[in-house]
Amino acid sequence: TRKEGVSRTYKGYDGYAPIMAYIGTEGYLVNAQLREGKQHCQCDTPAFLRETIAMCRQITDEPLLIRLDSGNDSAENIGILLESDCYFIIKRNLRRESKDDWFEMAKAKSQNVTAPREGKTVYTGSDWKPVSYTTAD
């Protein structure tokens, strides 16, 4: 295809790499960018986060909960969210970490362990690490 911005995605298809931000339980669109398909999801995300948080602050004074995918698990994003007084959930990117080591840490740090059905155990807790970061802009 010759559409502007279309390129090979990481899944091997021609397409785009959109990024979108919604607010509220109703899911109102606050911000969106249609980015080139070959672009990594973290590329330009710090600026998008800042812009989106500023837009949300114009809409509400309520606390913000930001959810990000594992591709956005970066110290820079965490720093922006901490400085902006946002709550956040970021899917962990294990990178080169051992899944077994991560599971042992999760079990050790859990304050609540439930078994909603046979064969499924849910560990709920938190573990905070010091994060140092610099922003690109």
Predicted regions and their residues:
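Short, conserved catalytic/metal-binding motifs centered on acidic residues
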Residues: 1, 27, 64-73, 88
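Active-site-proximal, Lys/Arg-enriched surface segment
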Residues: 1-21
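Gly-rich Lys/Arg/Thr-decorated short loops/hinges at beta-loop-alpha junctions or inter-strand turns
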Residues: 25-36
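Active-site beta-loop-alpha junctions of metal-dependent nucleic acid enzymes
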Residues: 34-55
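Active-site beta-loop-alpha junctions enriched in small/polar residues
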Residues: 35-37, 69-73, 93-95
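A conserved hydrophobic secondary-structure block that centers on an alpha-helix together
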Residues: 55, 60-67
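Short, surface-exposed basic-aromatic patches at helix termini and helix-loop junctions that form
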Residues: 78-87
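An anionic, glycine-rich sequence signature occurring as long contiguous blocks
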Residues: 87-137
